[in-house]
Amino acid sequence: PSNAKELIDKKLEERNIIYKNLFVYDENTVIKTKYFNIEFFRTTHSIPDSHGVVIHTPDGTIVMTGDFKFDMTPIGPMSNLHKMAKIGEKGVSVLMSDSTNALVPGVSLSESVVDENLGEIFSSCKDSRIILATFASNVYRIKHIMETCKKNKRKVALFGRSMENMVDVALKCGYFKDKDIVITAEEANHMKPNEVCLLCTGSQGEPLAALSRIASGTHRQITLMPDDVVIFSSSPIPGNGASVSKTINKLYKKGVKVFTNAMSEIHSSGHANQEELKLMIRLFKPRYFVPYHGEFRMLKTHADLGVMCGVNKNNTFVLENGDVLNLRKGVVTPGGKVQAGEVYVDGSRIGEVGSAVIKDRILMSNNGILVIIANIDTENKVLLGTPAVTTRGYILVNENEDLIRDIQSISQGIINKCLKSKYFNYNDMKSEIINGLIPFLSDKTGRVPIILPIVMDVKTKKEN
């Protein structure tokens, strides 16, 4: 869709990448290849122009829903249930369906209800400045907020790079018609509180996002006032609850009024609840069912919903990343496993950097590195001099002479002990140095850097 293309073009432009092989599709597009054809069906989600994908192959038809919900009163276009049903009537071998809300019973809240509730808050807070945080990708929500602001004679100031980019793209694509409603931060600061709405990122409590900085009092352009109203038109993504609570607590300490989805229905998930998931299965009537996009418990629950809707239990597959299924002549069978997971890009190398290297880099960036250099004479099994110690990003050597001497002493003792061993080898010596220093450094400094022992064999000349 045009919205996605504009966002990709903007990302490429930021990185000075020229790429012209981007093509815009719509619901009527059919992509034909040598071995299979691809078509699309419109779905409803929190992002605009979302579509599911249908892949027609000689061995059967595969449907992938993408993220979706069924909203009978959406702000944007409705899902094309008629096309889904037609595809289902022709026969679907495999349905792969979004499992994000598979644990949630019932039907997801309509975006129109959110629309009404946000409108009521705006009406009840006519004299206050409104600061509203939501997902930048939720274009139809932002469209409604702008329309509500226009009804209430408010201008909208944008805060947060992703919010600014998304609104810019949405204006280009025609989702928003009224460009004059958007003003700059400087203009907002010169307007009365009841004449402006600050639309910002940070609904998930991200430390560097606009709302978090406003709550902390570190935002360069916005200072909270006691009569301000802050609206979280969102719900915490799993794992972000603590960050969101921290931001909300900071706002309460500033004395502002806060609205959250827990208090009012001012956010709707973009993912289908159980009854909507059942409807998707009923529309496509697949022979095989593969729930995806969710934790294992969500996938398992979704698979059980498939069985409830008529799919043979033996024809449901709860997979982990990397699991392979083979589709041959309409029959699906397990096909082993492939390597799957993060692919790290390191300069010009792709996929060559393992997680251990990334872990070391994170550790170095947080705690620094400590290098111990020792010269030994393996032939005579003696340590030549005191080990040298240097650090980067951990401590300053000149300001911690006592600590450095202790490190040297511990290292020296470990090396001498290893040299006396009958089965001495370099790797064991290095491991002993590391294991000996970790508890000491943790106790003395509260941090443990990467410890890198370097042991060199120096040959000494014997006197005749």
Put a short name on every predicted segment.
Residues 1-191, 209-223, 242-246:
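His/Asp/Glu-rich metal-coordinating catalytic cores
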Residues 92, 127, 277-294, 449:
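Proline-aspartate-enriched helix->loop->beta-strand connector
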Residues 108-114, 179, 200-216, 239-243, ...:
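A general structural motif
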Residues 251-272, 276:
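Generic long, charged, amphipathic alpha-helical segments
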Residues 290-330:
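Anionic-ligand-binding alpha/beta catalytic cores of soluble enzymes and soluble regulatory domains
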Residues 357-450, 455-458:
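Conserved bacterial/organellar gene-expression machines centered on ribosome-associated P-loop NTPases
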